[in-house]
């Protein structure tokens, strides 16, 4: 009897331990699934909340009558940029005049008007139907209204081509806008040789045109002054004979209205691959491996010649 009671007690305690372990395991599994469900519901709530915020911004933007509205949040996939004003010289960070900015027309983008589409270079996202965009008059580059407005708060040039932005009226009535920069410069220089009294007016006309360099030239400087090969061109040109200052490449040009900034121009030759191949051809005869191969080729050619003679 004693042995049976002991065996029954051990079995009862064993079953009781297994039952406790099962309850603990069940409670752990239920707790884990409850936590996962709570996180999933929290994620869905957050997505719904931000979706309502985006819809609110879109509604305010559509109802706004201001074409230059800078409300952020029209497209959830758009990158948001804030161009903060730095504490540098205001002459170097002068933004575009508000009158010129307002004179640039605002258009509504349509995919049918642009077969290849249109990408905003400021936020790096494509324009979709219904987006408001500004098309710059001189270079015909288009950008989002809010993006280009923030850009022009600290810049006065196009983000893509760096050409100076002017009003639509100036672009329409400008006589020399369609000429390339080098042709305009050469024609104006020859005119100044025949009529020196128009030197100062020609300098002012030439300085308003944006400088254009080839794609293989790197230029450093500010947007008001660029110096290359001794020739200095500024927006605020000093008084004097332009032809004389152009011919004298060694003389330093100075201006009382604009600071002189040194420009570093690095010319990258286009025929770099050809020069590299020529250099390799010149270095190959100097290598010992090439010399051995040439000697072996000569020996084989001699043996072949002897066999043919026999």
From Swiss-Prot:
InterPro entries: ATL1/ATL16-like (IPR044600), Znf_RING (IPR001841), Znf_RING/FYVE/PHD (IPR013083). This is RING-H2 finger protein ATL60. It is an enzyme of class 2 (transferase). GO terms for biological process: protein ubiquitination. Residues 170-201, 240-260 are annotated as: Disordered. It is a single-pass membrane protein. It comes from Arabidopsis thaliana (Mouse-ear cress). Residues 179-201 have a biased composition (Polar residues). CDD domains: RING-H2_EL5-like. GO terms for cellular component: membrane. Its main location: membrane. It catalyses: S-ubiquitinyl-[E2 ubiquitin-conjugating enzyme]-L-cysteine + [acceptor protein]-L-lysine = [E2 ubiquitin-conjugating enzyme]-L-cysteine + N(6)-ubiquitinyl-[acceptor protein]-L-lysine. SUPFAM superfamilies: RING/U-box. The RING-type zinc finger domain mediates binding to an E2 ubiquitin-conjugating enzyme. The chain crosses the membrane at residues 24-44. Pathway: Protein modification; protein ubiquitination. It holds the Pfam family zf-RING_2. A zinc finger (RING-type) spans 120-162. Its EC number is 2.3.2.27. The keyword Membrane applies. PANTHER family: RING-H2 FINGER PROTEIN ATL16 (PTHR46913:SF1). One of its GO terms (molecular function) is zinc ion binding. Belongs to the RING-type zinc finger family. ATL subfamily.
């Amino acid at each position: 009897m004693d042995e049976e009671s002991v065996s029954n007690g051990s079995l009862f305690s064993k079953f009781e331990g297994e039952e406790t372990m099962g309850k603990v395991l069940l409670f752990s599994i239920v707790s884990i699934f409850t936590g996962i469900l709570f996180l999933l519901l929290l994620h869905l709530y957050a997505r719904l909340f931000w979706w309502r915020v985006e819809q609110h911004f879109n509604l305010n933007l559509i109802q706004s009558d201001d074409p230059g509205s800078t409300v952020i949040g029209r497209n959830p996939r758009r990158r948001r940029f804030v161009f903060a004003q730095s504490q540098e010289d205001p002459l170097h960070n002068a933004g575009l005049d508000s009158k010129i900015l307002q004179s640039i027309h605002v258009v509504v983008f349509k995919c049918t008007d642009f077969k290849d589409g249109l990408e905003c270079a400021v936020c790096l996202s494509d324009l979709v139907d219904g987006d408001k965009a500004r098309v710059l008059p001189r270079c015909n580059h288009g950008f989002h209204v809010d993006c280009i407005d923030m850009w022009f708060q600290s810049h006065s040039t196009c983000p893509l081509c760096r050409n100076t932005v002017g009003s639509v009226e100036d672009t329409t009535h400008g006589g020399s806008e369609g000429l390339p920069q080098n042709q305009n410069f050469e024609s104006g220089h020859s005119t100044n040789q025949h009529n020196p009294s128009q030197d100062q007016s020609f300098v002012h006309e030439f300085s308003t045109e944006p400088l254009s360099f080839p794609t293989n030239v790197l230029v450093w400087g500010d947007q008001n002054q660029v110096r290359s090969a001794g020739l200095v061109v500024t927006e605020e040109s000093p008084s004097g004979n332009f032809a004389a200052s152009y011919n004298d490449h060694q003389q330093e040009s100075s201006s009382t209205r604009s600071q002189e900034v040194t420009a570093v121009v690095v010319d990258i030759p286009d025929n770099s691959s050809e020069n590299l191949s020529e250099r390799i051809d010149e270095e190959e005869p100097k290598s010992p491996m090439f010399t051995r191969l040439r000697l072996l080729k000569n020996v084989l050619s001699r043996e072949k010649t002897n066999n043919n003679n026999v």
